[in-house]
Amino acid sequence: MKDLKNVFRQIEKVLRRSSWFDDGWEIYNRGVYMQLYKTNWHNQNQGGIHFETFIEPREIKQKAFPICMHAEEDCPSQDEFIQQFLTLERDRIKSWKGYQLGDGYSICKRTLPLNFKNLEQRLMEEFNRLRQLEAGIEEILQRVEY
């Protein structure tokens, strides 16, 4: 089995080297748990808007792990943000293979099989897919913040 902390460190390195990363993106990496978010998404304490994945003992046992988008308690006008965001992006998310709309602060989620063979590549693909939601997040944040 691969060293998962090392896998997450490698993913962080690749993300940071991406051409788009310097446009206000941040990473919170705690071993086998990672969030990707923009600086204006109210996620300074990991409780705002972010894309998230983790592979902890439960996921290893289940041989599957999630990648998701959350709008947690630090998101301004959280309920309104979620409602407006889903109105805007629901169809796009539903068109993505394997993605499900969530409940509460969990906007959407995909559960991936835990295959160590191309784990880094799979996670990069999913983070890049979720990044397509950036413009919608920005648009709705502007509406609910003012």
Map each language-model feature to its residues:
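Charge-biased C-terminal accessory regions appended to nucleic-acid-, cytoskeletal NTPase
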Residues: 83-146
